[in-house]
């Protein structure tokens, strides 16, 4: 309320101030010259406002002033984008319109009229535009939107601060919807002039009813349509209500022992909800409870089974929470009713007839007390005395004493003591005994075999003792010759005697004695007794000897000693006959006269004399006692112990086989008594340690165990055995098998072509088997691996592969494989070198190499040949040996297996000195061969050859040809063709320029064509291919199948018919053909010009020079096909020339190169190569049909030393040709040097 009063007073003061200023500035009547005047206005920030100004003189200049600042007569009012003049100036309307007002617009305004012809200057009264700024936010402490925890009854301070506003807002604080009266507010200046902030402070004391309610701070202002609010939720902590125990039933605390009691305890209210626990006599018994937040209830249920000792126990439930001042409690005292836990009868219910029986009955503690009564059968007996005493747990104990006379007819009746009470009407408590009245038996007898009957030992006999009457039941005791019969506790005799228990049938009692008869039962007396009564019977038992014993006159025997053995049969019924045998062989003995023995039987004896040997050791001498009447024999044996020195048995192993790196066991089969004291092994004169070693151990049986056996362990082992009687010796052989190892292999093995040779492989192996040698030939083709034409020979440790009439195809790598059954097999590679005379590559009768003869270029001549052994190359020029000491000549020689190359590099080629015929001669020990190479000038190319059709469609034809000599410069190809019946030729350049296949497109179906081919380079055109012979072609019709051979190599995809209109396509193709023809014709004309220029230059040289003659002759030469097919280098049957240019040549082999300057020859360094690889793959392919030399280099396998060129000694051979004139990219004739624009010779 105080805050509202303060705010209203501030607003009233502001209103009075504004009203006074208005009254001061604006008179009561409208001044002259104005028909409308501005008024004081109040608007909310962000709204639009209009100050009216109507002038009676429309032509006057009008402007507004803001706090004395002139805004200018411009209606757009520059510098104030939100200001503008509204209205019709012609009517004198100059209203000031302000958009989106803000605090800067809060000022005094006046409308001013300038002097004019129509009237004097005028000024309107000043008016005030008041801008109301609403508060944007409220800052609440504690923070708005949170949950604030307070304790009920305590005072707390809440602060609420408004944001900037004009005028100062009115702040109200509410809790649970009720306005808080204890509040104070302070109005402070805002962040800008004319703005205010209000800070309100309230003191709040929450109640439990405020829990989960909102505390709201509201700020109201004339600038707000509705108050703004900020709030937080109050979490009020308060203690719970007292706990209440909900007792089931009306009698609180009364309960019966054994009852399952469930007591709920409920505490309502509280924040947090109450924590409950149960106590019994002050001790916690349950701390589990549950809560129901929707009903604000805490509940705990105590579950217990009531026992008698719980009588008088105090059960209480306690409730409290974190803000409780103390613990609230509700308690109940238990009153427990419980019956006696047991009834006990003291005294014995067994008595002799006609004597008194005295008993006492006592009940355990009960609440309330119980009464006792006695029953005998269905007859109630009266007690002599009854007593009541205090018991446990507040209960009582009852006791009753009884005395009565025992009679025989009452025997077996039930005597019962019963306890009862009105509190336990549904239960009966009693204790019962069986009355036992004692009296004696009347008769006793035995049932069993009749006396005098002969029973064989082992027979099962059943004796039954019977008696009539008697209580207690007669025990019926059995006796044997005055000794009590009992079952033996020894396991071996557990089945001999079985004594049954006393059994009753009516008034008759019986007890069974079952026994298996033995010698001790013979003539024995068996008696049964029951009290003073007894009965007896006697058995007659026949039995074999109870024991047969052998007595000896000596214990230690040696071969040749005499031994006397006596056999004694202790007792038998009837008497027995004795006999001797040794391991089944019957012996004669001497019998002694019979005599009396135990168990009323008879004894017998018989002796035998033996002479022993070592073979008798361990043998058994058996004495047999036989009863003819019983048909049974009892035997006993004596084992002979003969002392003798060690003797090796016949099954002793003499040879033991083992595998290297495996184990071996040298067994011992020896016989000795006593056992050998030591086993001593020796090997090659050295004794093996009995304690064992790194690779051997002597077993307890004397056997020798070896492991990690090596071939050095092979040999004879000697064993010495010794005991106290003497020594013995044996020899065993250990045969160690080991994997084969190739010891000798002649690598390489050399043979001349057509000769014979043996490839010898010698091994070290054990065992040596006849078929353990195998041979393999290493090659890529199965045909290369066949050994059918070779002979395999094996003799002992040496295997041979014999080759007859050696051929070049048999040269290469072979592998000797030896397998004697012990892994791993041995393998080793070797090389077969087939020596043959050199064979130089003869691609054509004459090879041309072009180079510029201006003494600035270099040329390289390549000569390649095959041959074994290594080849030495020599060069001649025009038949004269070439002087390689001349620095202008450099030769590089390369060797790779049987392929050899010589590169002759001529520096500063001179037309006068070097345009000549060079001859390369390859020589080895078996012969020589040579070839010629012509060094010529750079010239126009030779005509291509072999133009043929490889594919044909209605609109295209695939062509293929072989290029001619390019003249030492890059050459290109041009195709000329014409359609029969159509005038004019068509020219097509082949793309890419150096391709040798091309697809000619744009043809018409079912049309005959003629095709020509020519080549050109920077110096001119060649003649037409195949001496100008035309190639006739007829395209198939659209419905005819197209011919496309399997080996077609098209370079451009055929452009067949498509969905485009045919006429535009034909026009486009025609335009392309015209352009192509123009280019070809232009090229021909230009080449002719160059040729005329070259001919002019050549006229100044010697017309009859030898070089020019040779060149011209060679250019016109053709391959005649007269050479032998084995030396031909082409793969087809057509006779075509072969040319080699410097641009085409690049060594395909990077072999170990050697620069031959003075000495040449085979160094033999390659003999240590680890793997021969395809040593003579290229040699094996010397004679295939029409075989070319090209694949020769592709198939050569390089060794690891051949993968790079030595950088320190040799340059990359491909760099030799870097300066060849043919490598110049000068395709334009004008850019060609003058001396290269024609033939110099």
From Swiss-Prot:
Effect listed in the UniProt record for changing residue 173 to N: In NPHS1; lack of protein expression on the cell surface
Biased composition, class Basic and acidic residues, residue ranges: 1099-1114
Signal sequence region: 1-22
Phosphothreonine modified-residue sites: 1101
Post-translational note: Phosphorylated at Tyr-1193 by FYN, leading to the recruitment and activation of phospholipase C-gamma-1/PLCG1. Tyrosine phosphorylation is reduced by high glucose levels. Dephosphorylated by tensin TNS2 which leads to reduced binding of NPHN1 to PIK3R1.
Any Pfam family matching the protein: V-set
Annotated segments matching region Binds to NPHS2: 1160-1241
GO molecular function, a single term: myosin binding
Gene Ontology terms: cellular component: cell projection; cell-cell junction; extracellular exosome; focal adhesion; plasma membrane; slit diaphragm
Record-level GO BP terms: cell-cell adhesion; gene expression; glomerular basement membrane development; JNK cascade; myoblast fusion; podocyte development; positive regulation of actin filament polymerization; protein localization to synapse
Effect of residue 1138 to F: Increased mTORC1 complex activation
Residue ranges that the UniProt entry lists as topological domain Cytoplasmic: 1077-1241
Positions of modified residues (Phosphotyrosine): 1193
Effect of residue 528 to F: In NPHS1; lack of protein expression on the cell surface
Keywords annotated in UniProt: Cell adhesion, Cell membrane, Developmental protein, Disease variant, Disulfide bond, Glycoprotein, Immunoglobulin domain, Membrane, Myogenesis, Phosphoprotein, Repeat, Signal, Transmembrane, Transmembrane helix
Cystines in this chain: 53-111, 160-217, 265-317, 361-417, 465-528, 567-623, 761-816, 863-920
Broad class of the protein's primary localization: membrane
Chain ranges of the Fibronectin type-III domain: 943-1038
Tissue: Specifically expressed in podocytes of kidney glomeruli.
Annotated segments matching region Disordered: 1025-1057, 1099-1137
Similarity-based family: Belongs to the immunoglobulin superfamily.
Protein's name in the database: Nephrin
Source species: Homo sapiens (Human)
